[in-house]
Amino acid sequence: MRNVTRSHMVLHQIQSVLKKYEEVSAQELYESLDKGTVQREFGVRSVDLSRLSVSEEQFSELLLLFKLYSDQQQQSSIEFVATVPSEVDVRLRKTIAVIREMIHGAQNTILVTGYAVSEYVDEIMERVLEKALAGVNVDIFLDRNPQTDRYIENIRGRNLPSNFNVYVYKGSQGYSSLHAKVIMVDEEKAFVSSANLSYNGIVNNIEIGTLVGGEKILVIKNVLLELVKNNYFEKIIWYA
């Protein structure tokens, strides 16, 4: 029991140091360890190691191992997702389950792009609106078509918050429609799929997508922001 308690104390101290120096790279930490300066540069000497029964060298090495593990966890991750017949055993999560989980878990931002938004996904889009009302910043990018018009008219006149933004693709010569299907939450995870936000896309068609994590997904948002900047989208104004 004593060893378990000590392990928790060591872990807590390591996490505290890593949080304090989270901007420092693992390479910098390794170089300091190699030079024998990690104790001074990273505040290890301020830690009461006598209570932990570890030496400065042991603590520093553990610090580096946890930093390497933390950096590895933050790198890009990919999970495949599919809409397939129930009798097909592909051991992949279903599209609808992933979409609901992402929206439910969003804390800061939600970004949605789609070609079609049918009545079938009204419940999902309602959850997105509820998140906006709770303070989550929402940006929705849609193609111009009858389904988009229906969705906009359905929510127009409601008490929509200023952080709930809908952009409609204007169309341009050579680029006839917005066909990208992406859901991104908290700028940490992006679901990129062939599936439209419709019954066919989520239930009836065979669709494959990827759930991607990591900093590289911000490229998606940057592309959309550049399109907005270059006047490819019309922002819907809810109030005159």
Swiss-Prot record:
Residues 174-201 form the PLD phosphodiesterase domain. Disulfide bonds: none annotated. PROSITE patterns: PLD. Its EC number is 3.1.-.-. Pfam families: PLDc_2. It comes from the Bacteria. Disruption phenotype: Differentially required for bacteriophage defense; when this gene is missing the DISARM system still confers resistance against phi105, phi29, phi3T, SPP1 and SPR but reduced protection against Nf and SPO1 in B.subtilis. GO terms for molecular function: hydrolase activity; phosphatidyltransferase activity. The keyword Metal-binding does not apply. It is found in: Cytoplasm. One of its GO terms (cellular component) is cytoplasm. GO terms for biological process: cardiolipin biosynthetic process; defense response to virus; DNA restriction-modification system. InterPro entries: PLD-like_dom, PLipase_D/transphosphatidylase. The active site is at H179, K181, D186. Keywords: Antiviral defense, Cytoplasm, Hydrolase, Restriction system. Belongs to the phospholipase D family. Component of antiviral defense system DISARM (defense island system associated with restriction-modification), composed of DrmE, DrmA, DrmB, DrmC and DrmMII. DISARM is probably a multi-gene restriction module, this subunit is probably a phospholipase or nuclease. Expression of DISARM in B.subtilis (strain BEST7003) confers resistance to phages Nf, phi29, phi105, phi3T, SPO1, SPR and SPP1. Protection is over 10(7)-fold against phi3T, 10(4)-10(5)-fold against Nf, phi29, phi105 and SPR, 100-fold against SPO1 and 10-fold against SPP1. This is DISARM protein DrmC. It comes from Bacillus paralicheniformis (strain ATCC 9945a / NCIMB 11709 / CD-2). The lineage of its organism: Bacteria, Bacillati, Bacillota, Bacilli, Bacillales.
